[in-house]
A protein has these predicted regions:
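Pyridoxal 5′-phosphate
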Residues: 1-287
């Protein structure tokens, strides 16, 4: 879709160049939702549907259930990018019916440089190794090799052991929390901040509906987003600026980047108030 992170666009484009695959993109409508009519009209003949669960720019959750149902009705498999969605709510891959689901540790209190791909059994049995070396082999001779039949056939070489241990600890911690309760608490903070930003003359990108994520992307009509980031950083406030690795979506919105405030389990309403206090001070001084 036009909402995808670059990581769900770039390599498909590389494969299209290498093997002639046809790529089709589902557009975003003016209300920031996907054009589901266009999706249904363009899915014929597709083999794989790749879709982000929740936009890392807008925080808007896509209608995943409908997307998966329509894909399966047309014989296509579904790869769900849950890097942004999984840290904020409990996602049951089996109930959704997704064939594959991708996660990233750094979005859920874990280390950088490690992620995972969950695959259902039917899809897993059809997947072949894509990288050679190390423990992914069963036997090796000078004439040829055979490969492990379990998940190890995809894990060539020395794995990221320290990162995996760190992620396990993070998942154990998150498992002690009620993520659905945390989601509602953080969504309340995001809604409050979004309303305050609008009252200060900001344009806020996102809806913050019940199923959406607690990220708030915004722009000031005159003060550049990078200036905001530096000025907030000097006050001890961390925000993200730029295109957020989602340039096609930003192009659709007609902008080059936003300021993004991301609220997670360690944030409180007091943090939000402090952020707004610093932001008001910046506006008084510079805008």
């Amino acid at each position: 879709t036009e909402k995808e992170h670059h990581s769900d666009i770039d390599h498909w484009q590389m494969l299209a160049v290498a093997f002639g695959n046809e790529l089709r993109y589902v557009p975003v409508k003016g209300d920031l939702t996907l054009d589901m009519e266009e999706y249904e009209a363009s899915i014929e003949g597709a083999g794989l549907v790749c879709v982000v669960h929740t936009s890392n720019v807008l925080g808007v959750r896509n209608p995943i259930e409908d997307i998966i149902r329509i894909a399966h009705e047309n014989g296509a498999r579904v790869l769900l990018d849950a890097a942004q969605g999984a840290p904020h709510c409990q996602i049951n891959m089996a109930e959704l019916g997704a064939d594959m689901m991708a996660l990233s540790a750094h979005k859920m209190c874990g280390p950088t440089g490690i992620g995972c791909l969950l695959v259902n059994e039917e899809t897993f049995q059809e997947m072949k190794p894509f990288m050679g070396g190390g423990d992914m082999i069963e036997t090796v001779t000078l004439e040829g090799s055979t490969y492990q039949t379990n998940e190890h056939r995809f894990e060539a070489g020395t794995p990221r052991i320290a990162e995996a241990i760190g992620w396990k600890s993070a998942l154990d911690y998150l498992g002690q929390l009620n993520l659905n309760e945390q989601h509602q608490r953080l969504l309340g903070i995001a809604r409050y901040v979004a309303d305050e930003l609008r009252s200060l003359g900001m344009t806020v990108y996102g809806r913050h509906d019940d199923n959406d994520s607690s990220v708030v992307s915004f722009l000031h009509p005159t003060l550049h987003s990078e200036d905001f980031a530096h000025l907030l950083d000097a006050r001890g406030v961390a925000v993200r600026t730029g295109h957020h690795c989602a340039q096609p979506l930003l192009n659709r919105l007609g902008i080059s980047g936003t300021v993004r405030a991301s609220f997670y389990i360690y944030n409180t309403m007091e943090d939000a108030e402090e952020f707004l206090t610093h932001l008001r001070d910046i506006l008084e001084r510079f805008a």
